[in-house]
Amino acid sequence: MTNPIIPRVGIATDAHQIEAGKPCWIACLLFEGVDGCEGHSDGDVVAHAIVDALLSASGLGDLGSFVGVGRPEYDGVSGTQLLKEVRELLSAHGYVIGNVAAQLVGQTPKFGPRREEAQQVISEIIGAPCSLSATTTDHMGFTGRSEGRASVATAVVWKA
């Protein structure tokens, strides 16, 4: 009798303050004419939340332990690069990515017109389905006041 494949689920949140003049990277896409988010990296809250959820699901730590803020080689690193590296890390530990889902929380950018493009880009990077959505908080809180953006993500992985 073989052991059943048991999926592992991870969840994560990421948030960054908006920084005037910084390029806006969301879900591995550049949004022209919109201020981006501050951070040690590119400030892509969606990519970062997905990376963190994948690490959570696999039990391999979290975003802070994965890249840290004191490592100069990650200064300005893109969400795309982080997703590639976490996929390689999971694979090296025998994990397969089942799927990921993430939601962007913020007033800007208008995400709907590029949602499918972002899903395709992230799916290609991680080698698994990706579902994305976006919402506002009806002008409540730091995201509602356009002081920052946040993202919540879930990921499903299993041992190969």
Curated annotation (Swiss-Prot):
The record's remark on the cofactor is:
Binds 1 divalent metal cation per subunit.
According to the UniProt entry, its GO molecular function terms are: 2-C-methyl-D-erythritol 2,4-cyclodiphosphate synthase activity; metal ion binding
Which cofactor(s) does the record list?
a divalent metal cation
- Supply the Gene3D superfamilies for this chain: 2-C-methyl-D-erythritol 2,4-cyclodiphosphate synthase
The chain's disulfide connectivity reads: none
The name of this protein is: 2-C-methyl-D-erythritol 2,4-cyclodiphosphate synthase
UniProt record similarity statement: Belongs to the IspF family.
The source organism is Corynebacterium glutamicum (strain ATCC 13032 / DSM 20300 / JCM 1318 / BCRC 11384 / CCUG 27702 / LMG 3730 / NBRC 12168 / NCIMB 10025 / NRRL B-2784 / 534)
Query: Which residue positions does UniProt flag as site: Transition state stabilizer?
Result: H40, T136
If you read the UniProt record, what top EC class would you report for this enzyme, in one word?
lyase
Chain sites annotated for binding a divalent metal cation: D14, H16, H48
Sorted alphabetically, the Gene Ontology BP terms of this entry are: isopentenyl diphosphate biosynthetic process, methylerythritol 4-phosphate pathway; terpenoid biosynthetic process
Name the catalysed reactions: 4-CDP-2-C-methyl-D-erythritol 2-phosphate = 2-C-methyl-D-erythritol 2,4-cyclic diphosphate + CMP
**What job does this protein perform?**
Involved in the biosynthesis of isopentenyl diphosphate (IPP) and dimethylallyl diphosphate (DMAPP), two major building blocks of isoprenoid compounds. Catalyzes the conversion of 4-diphosphocytidyl-2-C-methyl-D-erythritol 2-phosphate (CDP-ME2P) to 2-C-methyl-D-erythritol 2,4-cyclodiphosphate (ME-CPP) with a corresponding release of cytidine 5-monophosphate (CMP).
